[in-house]
Amino acid sequence: MRTIIDRDSAPDGVVFRRTLQGPERELVDAFIPAMPLVHAPDSRVTILREPGLESGYPDLVIVVWRDSRTANWGDARLALVPDDLRLMHYIFQRRRADHSELQDIFGSRFARYSTERLHDARLVRLAGQAWFPCAFDRTFAATKIIAVEAKIGKWTDVLNQARLNTWFASKSYILVPRVSEDQVQEAQQFGIGVVAHEQDSIREWDARTEPLPRSYASWVVNDLAWRASIKHRNR
């Protein structure tokens, strides 16, 4: 099942940029139904159109995720804000974080209330004076986060944005109507994939796959896909 989320259908409190009419929108519109995407049959696919992230507004963020992993997510998870997920990613990376360490880095007041929210949402557990991440397969649902940056012309600009997208995505692609071999080679030096949508055919040069989560923004995108699915089901 594929669900497309844009500014008009986004969850409350989430910033999306309105998609403007023009040749780049036409390129993206044509690509979405023809998009080659392999995923497990029990996965859901949520396509975010121009979500607002710290690195910009990527044209598409495709999130492949397991609904079964969200079975115990509820209102406490919905109450989390991006800064909570920033602290969560820190604990996830450290595998163990003393509460005093979190206070030093994030501030005493925020560390206290954020860890309480994360604990209520079943993302972290407390043992003594240290916080530990809960089981990954119950806290992170995304198996793929694929960013797609579309452009007609301005190759350098689209390459730079695609490189920024590797901050949160497991794969980052450039979508263009046509591409040269030199441009493909340049992109692949940075692990960026290229998709050329030429009339009725699609040519793909694969992107390097990176493990998730890449950063706290991966957690933000992960939760955004889940939150968007709730709103979509309740419409």
Report the location of each language-model feature.
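Nucleic-acid nuclease catalytic cores
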Residues: 152-155, 169-200
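Short glycine/proline-enriched coil/turn segments at helix->beta-strand junctions
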Residues: 107-108, 167-171
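Acidic-basic catalytic patches of nuclease active cores, encompassing PD-(D/E)XK
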Residues: 2-67, 77-128, 232-235
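Non-catalytic C-terminal interaction segments of nucleic acid-processing enzymes
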Residues: 15-19, 47-48, 52-54, 68-86, ...
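A generic fold-level signal
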Residues: 55, 140-142
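Active-site-adjacent loop/helix micro-motif of nuclease/hydrolase catalytic cores
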Residues: 71-72, 143, 153-164, 175-176, ...
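Short, contiguous strand/loop micro-motifs
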Residues: 101-102, 147-149, 170-171
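Conserved catalytic cores of phosphodiester-cleaving nucleases, focusing on short active-site segments
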Residues: 60-68, 135, 143-152
